[in-house]
Amino acid sequence: MVCGGFSCSKNCLCALNLLYTLVSLLLIGIAAWGIGFGLISSLRVVGVVIAVGIFLFLIALVGLIGAVKHHQVLLFFYMIILLLVFIVQFSVSCACLALNREQQGQLLEVGWNNTASARNDIQRNLNCCGFRSYNPNDTCPASCAKSTQKCSSCAPIIGEYAGEVLRFVGGIGLFFSFTEILGVWLTYRYRNQKDPRANPSAFL
């Protein structure tokens, strides 16, 4: 059967949702791995990653069930939710790619000041103290603070990687944004196709 028929649309939609399922399980696994190995101690960061993973898993599950059963209501809600996710993700991805170094620094400083546990993780893993300057009276978990070695500030070290990370996140986000708009198009098309095995007198 040529691609574009009922079976092809169904198989493509199932494959797309299986991909989303794998990505969601990967996100949850990475968060659990980070906590298990002590790389991340911020429950807020881990909670956000796990919440995104669960949300993506539920969306994929709805899409998969709707595709397998050709369920009109599930497919409709799946299409609407996927469209909303596309709009948000596309906007965030474009923002990540558009940030200049000054804006990146301001964003990093806001995050630094509002996440104490993540701040401690960064200082410990990168062996630096303070964002732009280090106050010896402040508590710092970095090894340099416990020795005679001079501690450098974290802003220059984080800044080296921030641009690359934002470009990577923006690129990955754009890729998945286009898979989501593909999913919306496939779902719309699949909903309006008639199952060849169904009763010929039935409506779709």
UniProtKB/Swiss-Prot annotation:
Topology Extracellular: residue spans: 41-44, 94-167
GO CC annotation terms, alphabetical: plasma membrane
Q: Name one GO biological process term.
A: regulation of calcium ion transmembrane transport
- The glycosylation sites are 113, 137
InterPro entries tied to this protein: Tetraspanin/Peripherin, Tetraspanin_animals, Tetraspanin_EC2_sf
Tell me how this protein sits in the membrane.
Multi-pass membrane protein
Which residue positions does the secretion signal occupy?
Answer: none
Residues on the membrane's Cytoplasmic side span: 1-19, 66-72, 189-204
Places the protein is found: Membrane
Transmembrane regions: 20-40, 45-65, 73-93, 168-188
GO molecular function terms noted in the UniProt entry:
calcium channel regulator activity
User: What does the UniProt keyword field contain?
Assistant: Glycoprotein, Membrane, Phosphoprotein, Transmembrane, Transmembrane helix
**Which residues does this entry mark as bearing Phosphoserine?**
143
Stored PANTHER family? TETRASPANIN, TETRASPANIN-13
The similarity annotation says: Belongs to the tetraspanin (TM4SF) family.
| Protein name in the entry | Tetraspanin-13
Q: Which species expresses this protein natively? A: Mus musculus
